[in-house]
Amino acid sequence: MYAVAVSILFQDGKLDELKEFFENTGFPALEILKGDLYSIAFFNPKDNVNLGIAFMKDKETADKFAQIRNENLMQIQDLLASFPRVYEGELFTGKTLKDSLVEEPRESLFLAFAKLDVKNADEYMNLQKEIYLPKLEKDEGIISYGSIKIDDKTLVLFEFWTSHDAKHSFDEKLNADENVYEKFMPLMDGFT
């Protein structure tokens, strides 16, 4: 499986126009990838920032997705404050823990998303698999998680939660037992 994450900085006051574009033009343009594009989600952590993540079959699908994405971006270039940043790669880890969107439709989810600069991506993920993911998978609030290895020193991590409170409750429990996040600090070079 392959994943693509996109960060778009757009001009202040253009959020409604951007949403309208995605609904009326951007998403319909992706119909030709049906079956190979598994999932796509966008969210706005700030009024002028749009983050998106898409999951697809393989690199070939990602190349087709990039073509459509670039054509779409040309149509909204007057809304953009800068050229988008794109991170893509093979899905390094990933798991859907609950099919809660089918069983319990939700109007909203909480997405925790980070780009990490690490000293060694494989070492970081081995530690993640050893001490973090087993605790994560037991939590009631987690829906799905994964990471994308961009290169040997860059990872994109994401977690879908039932709510913002569920994520923060998990972090508090994790730090109450032991400060798990501290164990990752020697492997970090930075994050955004």
Task: Put a short name on every predicted segment.
Residues 1-51, 55-192:
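Short S/T/G/P-rich N-terminal loop/turn motif that feeds into the first structured element of a domain
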